[in-house]
Amino acid sequence: MSEMSYLEKLLDGVEVEWLPLGEITKYEQPTKYLVKAKDYHDTYTIPVLTAGKTFILGYTNETHGIYQASKAPVIIFDDFTTANKWVDFDFKAKSSAMKMVTSCDDNKTLLKYVYYWLNTLPSEFAEGDHKRQWISNYSQKKIPIPCPDNPEKSLAIQSEIVRILDKFTALTAELTAELTAELNMRKKQYNYYRDQLLSFKEGEVEWKTLGEIGKWYGGGTPSKNKIEFWENGSIPWISPKDMGRTLVDSSEDYITEEAVLQSSTKLIPANSIAIVVRSSILDKVLPSALIKVPATLNQDMKAVIPHENILVKYIYHMIGSRGSDILRAAKKTGGSVASIDSKKLFSFKIPVPNINEQQRIVEILDKFDTLTNSITEGLPREIELRQKQYEYYRDLLFSFPKPETVSN
């Protein structure tokens, strides 16, 4: 049976009426549900929500003004971006621009049917547009309601569509969880073998401080007021926001040769190892990466080019393995933003075996890297494929005959 014939069989010849969303739903402003506290903590129990990608901003211990979605689920809708979420648990709201949307009559229109249909609409958000979208736009959009004159039949059709999409959603979430678990297992396995390979008995090899292993470079920020430093720049200017990868060959920002010549930032040769030395991320991890191209750094970064007879890949793997130890030894105490004490960083010691042993270790770890990276790269692709498959069937289930008067 084809997908279209399934929808036709589901409708079984019934009439479909396209009704304005504002006629079948109602909304509530979030005023009495807005969170007052600014500090959230994972030990608290009430989620603080936004309709955007972040969704759960944190947790609060406030006990008043809780929206009880556990009793009656709700759609939260961002009045500016049109982002929306299905919520079936109690929460506090963060933004006054959020609307809580519910069905006018649960005996005629299933709210989750509305939610799934709402997500078939293309985003109309425009950067800088501060127009309130629900009243001026979305409440007037028309949603297909099968046989509205027969609520029992209508709810049966809506329920079947919701059931199918719930199943697709659950399967997609299950697959994502399985792939993520596989990736985490591979990473743990890789970290274990890496740490074993980079562990040496006392006296077995020479130990050097990080300051002794190579030439270190600092970073700087060319003046933002000089357009000639930034416009049409071609030299990577790496900052902590670029350090989500272990191999870096591009950056979010680029600068010009003039900026290198006339500012505190310096051009660093290719095949350096960069680390973040000032960022809130240092409260959790020490980001490090192999920089494959000539590049510059901002002032929150440092990079090293190892001396002769010390392989860059060996130092890259070693810093990755010793990241937690380096943080414990060199992170400054106090201060509004976490940072690394350069003197303590440069005095941190690591084992440096002969170059043949370095090469052996690097070859083994590179093989593990290749395996882990293939899974890391494949995971988003597989998830994206499943999401597109889900969206295809979702849109198909809502492909009701549309009269010419409906222009959604």
Model regions: which residues?
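Charged, alpha-helix-forming regions
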Residues: 1-408
